[in-house]
Amino acid sequence: MPRDTNNRHRSTPYERPTLEDLRRQLQDNLDSINRRDRMQEEQEENLRYQVRRRQRQNQLRSIQMEQQRMMAELNNEPVINFKFECSVCLETYSQQSNDTCPFLIPTTCDHGFCFKCVINLQSNAMNIPHSTVCCPLCNTQVKMWRSLKPNAVVTCKFYKKTQERVPPVQQYKNIIKVLQERSVISVEDNDNNCDINMENQAKIAALEAELEEEKNHSDQVASENRQLIEENTRLNEQIQELQHQVRTLVPQRGITVNQQIGRDDSAPAELNERFRSLVYSTISELFIENGVHSIQNYVYAGTSAASSCDVNVTVNFGFEN
């Protein structure tokens, strides 16, 4: 068989990154981008939540301070003293404070009734299906009641509701308690409201500064992400180029080995077949295809050119008579 004796001095072949390495590097870059994006979104959401929470607290503090100021002004006003006689039970009530008056007036007329009689009217109407509450004096239908209070009018409406029977006095106390809770929000440490507001303002300023810093960091991360995306694009182009080269090199590596083996007609047929099989296996063990491909890489290493490689090896074995 012909042998190549010019391939004695070989240099190290040029090593290129494999497709698997490029894919792994690309996946690592994408995972890094996704992790940075998630961390950035979580930090921004946390900062926005803290800023909103501080703003709500400041608004609540402002409302509480305003309500306290209004209640203080109301308490400092002179007490209005007057007497009132209920038109139903004829009991006389005297007003000696600026709290909610203990009597109600229908919104449809000007007749006043004590709170106890109004609750009795509502209770009687609730016990009768499809009944309405009317003024006992003018028989005008009453849908809502109003309670007089200095500088304010409180309007209330009764609804039918299944519940345990509560004495009218207790109902009156419960409603007064609800009105007081709605009119004034309880505040702890009233003397330190100003200090708390200043502290909240300082915290908000610090959070805004931190938010600005996070935005700058976000811009930097976005710039790094763009660089990583460009790097990924470049790696994708390299992968496509290598895939194209692989598709181009695959047909070029085809090596045709034609083996022509004679036979001795005088020998038994099984001996001829055994000889032919051993020759085929010996030729395949010579690695002719791999050797030619190694020579091709050595010659064209480091260049984009690639020569076609089509080698025909003819092996003739004659039999001596």
UniProtKB/Swiss-Prot annotation:
Listed GO biological process terms: DNA replication; viral DNA genome replication
Superkingdom of source: Viruses
Gene Ontology cellular-component terms listed: host cell nucleus
Residue ranges covered by zinc fingers (RING-type): 86-139
PROSITE patterns: ZF_RING_1, ZF_RING_2
Cell compartment(s), UniProt: Host nucleus
Gene3D superfamilies per UniProt: Zinc/RING finger domain, C3HC4 (zinc finger) (3.30.40.10)
Pfam families: zf-C3HC4
InterPro entries xrefs: Znf_C3HC4_RING-type, Znf_RING, Znf_RING/FYVE/PHD, Znf_RING_CS
Keywords, sorted A to Z: DNA replication, DNA-binding, Early protein, Host nucleus, Metal-binding, Transcription, Transcription regulation, Viral DNA replication, Zinc, Zinc-finger
GO molecular function, one term: DNA binding
Region described as Leucine-zipper: 228-249
Function: Plays some regulatory role in both viral DNA replication and transcriptional transactivation.
Protein name: Major immediate early protein
Species assigned in the record: Autographa californica nuclear polyhedrosis virus (AcMNPV)
Gene that this polypeptide is encoded by: PE38
